[in-house]
């Protein structure tokens, strides 16, 4: 045995000093590895739609209702199943309604507790006692553990069981106990949650989604293009902050900045009112997709703010393009192509009339230079982003739990794309003087995204990293954007829709090719035959016959459109994916009405399940990434056991 191996075994022996302890741990590890694989839940492109997100999270994409049918399908009718499901999703709110309706609330408590305990036993059966115990609320952990481990068909145990429940009811703790059971069931039906990008965008409550995820038991993120924009703003990128504000103004969602995060937009409002007071800002009128009741004066002011921050954004983008020639984006220096006298712009060999040619803050001789007032404004805005504790807390969580891509249990997860040429080869990009492509490119993007947040302000490293974060939002070789260019300026200022076209990266055609998907999987160190790519970012237009299952099941696109704006395009309100011990299941969801309707009328999101792959042999923990680590531990312990038995090491006490 080599010296290093012996040193490692000696170190291991300090934790397992005897044959008995070593053998016991091996047995424990083998037992865990033989348990069924836990359920993974995949969500993508939530876009700030908290109500629908919360419902899908609470119902486990329909898993809870299916478990109820498994146990009580012959005992309960559909109405009773819906009622029990709603109770588990929203225990406190539902019990408030039930308490007003029930004549004998104690009898209802008793029946409900019996059912919840039986259901909890069922969903806990695939876990170790230790794992279930850790998931329990402290106040009820001892009693819950007793109740979940008993066999209540035995007469002597049944009386003990009923006595416990009777005491819970008589001591007025039934509602708290029901809530504890409901939350435990919610936690146990999903072992791990993957958010495949874009918590943020036009939806009103990304902050609530982040608060929820920060308290979720096991979660990871693959950053999306809208997430990266907010991360950039929180890191100190002025252009990212300008983009965040512009999008929020465009979709009448400034409340997320002012109310949810406490970022004052008063300086922007004052600046806009002064600079654009006689400007109708016709092409900057916000989109009122939710028909929110705003006064004409409010809409007018938001339109001014919208135009003011858009112009600042275009100037800041020009600064980056000029100083980062390696980004190869000079064709996006559109302020250079404007004829300010005639109100036209020259794009790709053609002249177009500008819809709006009122540019009071642009110097035609130096169009990207901020005015003194603009400079002061953006500095105030950046101070607000930097000093917003809640936003910084959320962004830190995104950094802690997130990444550009993730390999997990044989699958590859990423939000946008892997930039490809037409022939399927990986696109290259030069970063800090060296070219990268494929997996290495995404790894470098991640390193620089992290540097943008942690590098000291004012350093060249910080500035470069922040510029890369902006590039990830808009660049042609960005794995998060996936298009040739972002035509934001043209959509505001040019009527001809020919100029609005954003050509998708060849990836989006090639991802239908099984060979290409296998190539991508192998690039990231996965088995091309067994693995899958889980992708978000582009809404699947089911109404036009598009399928989320591509390349013979190698590619699964799970952006079905949580955002209400996409419902008409997708005919859906989102896809989610489940990966349990039996295989992969894609779940499509119809639009969600409201939390209030769900609680009062026991409505749920209508979900349709499609089995993608069914395992011939049920997957066990040993087949997972965690299982491989546990197996390595078991093998090391077997070596330690052999060393004890062969006299190479002596047992301690």
From Swiss-Prot:
Any GO molecular function: fructose 1,6-bisphosphate 1-phosphatase activity
GO BP terms: gluconeogenesis
Metabolic or biological pathway: Carbohydrate biosynthesis; gluconeogenesis
Gene3D superfamilies documented for this protein: 3.60.21.10
Keyword Hydrolase attributed: yes
The family this protein is said to belong to: Belongs to the FBPase class 3 family.
Keyword list, A-Z: Carbohydrate metabolism, Hydrolase, Manganese
Annotated source species: Listeria welshimeri serovar 6b (strain ATCC 35897 / DSM 20650 / CCUG 15529 / CIP 8149 / NCTC 11857 / SLCC 5334 / V8)
Catalyzed chemical reaction(s): beta-D-fructose 1,6-bisphosphate + H2O = beta-D-fructose 6-phosphate + phosphate
Protein name: Fructose-1,6-bisphosphatase class 3
One Pfam family in the UniProt entry: FBPase_2
Record's keyword annotation contains Hydrolase: yes
Cofactor annotation: Mn(2+)
Enzyme Commission designation: 3.1.3.11
């Amino acid at each position: 045995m080599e010296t290093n191996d012996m040193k490692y075994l000696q170190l291991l022996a300090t934790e397992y000093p005897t044959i008995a302890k070593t053998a016991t741990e091996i047995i424990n590890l083998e037992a865990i590895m033989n348990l069924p694989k836990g359920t993974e839940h995949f969500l993508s492109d939530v876009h700030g739609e908290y109500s629908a997100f919360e419902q899908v999270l609470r119902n486990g994409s329909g898993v809870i209702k299916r478990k109820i049918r498994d146990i009580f399908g012959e005992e309960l009718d559909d109405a009773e199943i819906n009622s029990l499901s709603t109770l588990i999703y929203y225990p406190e709110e539902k019990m408030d309604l039930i308490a007003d309706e029930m004549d004998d609330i104690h009898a209802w408590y008793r029946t409900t507790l019996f059912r919840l305990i039986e259901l909890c036993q069922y969903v806990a059966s695939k876990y170790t006692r230790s794992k279930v115990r850790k998931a329990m609320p402290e106040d009820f952990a001892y009693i819950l553990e007793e109740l979940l481990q008993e066999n209540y068909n035995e007469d002597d145990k049944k009386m003990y069981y009923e006595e416990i429940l009777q005491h819970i009811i008589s001591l007025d703790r039934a509602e708290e106990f029901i809530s504890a059971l409901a939350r435990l069931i919610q936690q146990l039906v999903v072992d791990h949650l993957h958010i495949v990008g874009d918590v943020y965008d036009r939806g009103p409550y990304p902050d609530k989604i982040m608060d929820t995820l920060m308290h979720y038991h096991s979660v990871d993120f693959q950053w999306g293009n809208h997430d990266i924009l907010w991360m950039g703003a929180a890191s100190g990128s002025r252009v990212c902050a300008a983009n965040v504000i512009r999008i929020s103004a465009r979709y009448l969602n400034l409340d997320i900045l002012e109310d949810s995060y406490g970022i004052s937009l008063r300086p922007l409002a004052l600046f806009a009112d002064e600079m654009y007071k006689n400007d109708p800002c016709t092409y900057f009128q916000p989109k009122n997709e939710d028909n929110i009741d705003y006064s004409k004066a409010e809409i007018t002011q938001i339109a001014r703010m919208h135009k003011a921050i858009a112009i600042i954004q275009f100037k800041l983008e020009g600064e980056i393009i000029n100083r980062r020639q390696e980004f190869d984006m000079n064709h996006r220096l559109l302020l250079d192509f404007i004829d300010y006298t005639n109100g036209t712009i020259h794009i790709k060999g053609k002249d177009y009339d500008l819809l709006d040619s009122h540019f009071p803050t642009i110097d035609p001789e130096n169009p990207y230079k901020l005015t003194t007032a603009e400079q002061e404004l953006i500095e105030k805005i950046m101070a607000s982003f930097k000093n917003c504790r809640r936003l910084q807390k959320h962004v830190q969580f995104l950094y802690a739990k997130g990444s550009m891509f993730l390999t997990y249990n044989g699958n590859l997860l990423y939000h946008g794309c892997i930039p490809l040429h037409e022939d399927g080869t990986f696109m290259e990009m030069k970063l800090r003087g060296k070219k990268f492509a494929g997996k290495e490119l995404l790894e470098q993007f991640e390193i620089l995204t992290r540097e943008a947040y942690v590098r000291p302000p004012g350093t060249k490293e910080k500035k470069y990293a922040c510029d890369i974060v902006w590039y990830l939002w808009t660049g042609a070789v960005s794995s998060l954007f996936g298009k040739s260019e972002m035509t934001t300026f043209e959509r505001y200022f040019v009527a001809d829709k020919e100029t609005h076209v954003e050509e998708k990266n060849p990836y989006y055609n090639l991802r239908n090719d099984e060979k290409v998907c296998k190539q991508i999987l192998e690039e990231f160190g996965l088995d091309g035959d067994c693995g899958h790519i889980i992708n978000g970012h582009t809404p699947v237009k089911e109404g036009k016959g598009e399928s989320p299952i591509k390349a013979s099941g190698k590619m699964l696109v799970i952006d079905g459109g949580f955002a209400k704006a996409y419902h008409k395009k997708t005919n859906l309100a989102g896809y989610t994916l489940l990966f349990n011990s039996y295989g992969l299941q894609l779940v499509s969801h119809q639009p969600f009405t409201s939390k209030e309707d769900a609680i009062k009328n026991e409505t749920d999101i209508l979900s349709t399940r499609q089995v993608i792959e069914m395992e011939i042999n049920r997957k066990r923990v040993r087949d997972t990434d965690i299982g491989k680590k546990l197996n390595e531990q078991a093998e090391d312990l077997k070596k330690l056991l052999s060393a004890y038995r062969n006299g190479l090491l002596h047992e301690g006490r």
